[in-house]
Amino acid sequence: MFSDTVVELEGVNGEVFNLTTGDQGVYLATDVEGCFYDPPVKVVFEEPGNYPGARYLNHRILKRDITFGVQILQDAKHGERSWLSRDSEWRKAWAFNRPCKLIVTTPDSGTRYLWVSLFESPKVDMKYDPRGNPINLTVMSCISYDPFWYEDDRVFYAKTKTDTRFKPTLFDIPGNWPWEELPKETLTITVDRSVGGLNPTDQYISPKWSVPGSTEKVPEFPWPFPPGVAIPWERAPFTQFVIPDYSFEDDEYANRRLKTPGLIYGENCIINTDRREEQFSSESGSPVWARTNGVRFRNMIPPYTEERTFVIEASGTAAGQLISLRLPRPWTRCWGLE
């Protein structure tokens, strides 16, 4: 039987093992459980007294409990090619509190990876001294807290071409700037099938945006900002953006977009639109999320969505600043489902 699947492991120490070719004398054994196919799922249902059978309510994708073995060769009694040395290098690649990267590459689906950690200590048969055997099976009991296989994120950029910076002191109301009067530039990012599709996976995804803060420091105010001293917002240069939060399943919100808070110097932000996460993370650590007035991103991109053009508005930016859109690629399996 011929297989062109390549399985690799990148350890917590950066060491890479090719478990298919055995480049370090470590080969993947048979009978892998809980790893390559769908993760376990728990269905939630109800059984009303006046209803025949049951009704589906929801389902939850669970962690993966993974068991597999590796065959570690002994090609020399001592040195780097001995079982003792190879087994030691294999163990040093693993940790309980940090994940390894299990990588699977196939001609059909490319490369996908799963984050795995130790769940129990590795086991080796000690009926005989393993240092005297030509080959030993090491059994690995692992856990994958995130059950999805990932491709590398797809990242798309929009670059500002117009200088839309302004002085906040030009406006009548200090600290309160009317969006309609700010100089603005409209940017677009188009994602379609020619670049792999918007979401070709079988899972919902939450886009991540990165937006830049102002390139200008607050006049007559020290940087880094001194703790306990109020920032003079009324004279602080800032950038501001309108970021898409399009719904692909509700026409009422098909063109929903949200305006970010003003971002001053040092507040380059990552916007994670996942409702379960902190949505604004500032480079300076400032709590930008506290200035959103409770308005949150809420829409995800459904599986197998082919294309969309995202329209972004930017104000307060210098020419040449970048706005990025990052799309994760989670899959239920390490191959297929395209």
Please provide the spans of the model-predicted regions.
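Short, charged, solvent-exposed linker or helix-capping segments at domain edges/interfaces
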Residues: Y150-A158
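Intrinsically disordered, low-complexity segments enriched in serine, threonine, and glycine
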Residues: Y157-E338
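Oligomerization/assembly interface segments of phage tail-like spikes and tubes
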Residues: E47, Y51-R81, G132-F148
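Solvent-exposed loop and beta-edge segments used for protein-protein assembly and interaction
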Residues: R60-R64, W94-F96, G132-N136, N199-Q203, ...
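Residue-level recognition of well-ordered beta-strand positions that form the cores
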Residues: T67-Q71, I103, S141-I143, K208-P212, ...
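Short, acidic/charged, Gly/Pro-enriched secondary-structure junctions
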Residues: L73, K77-K123
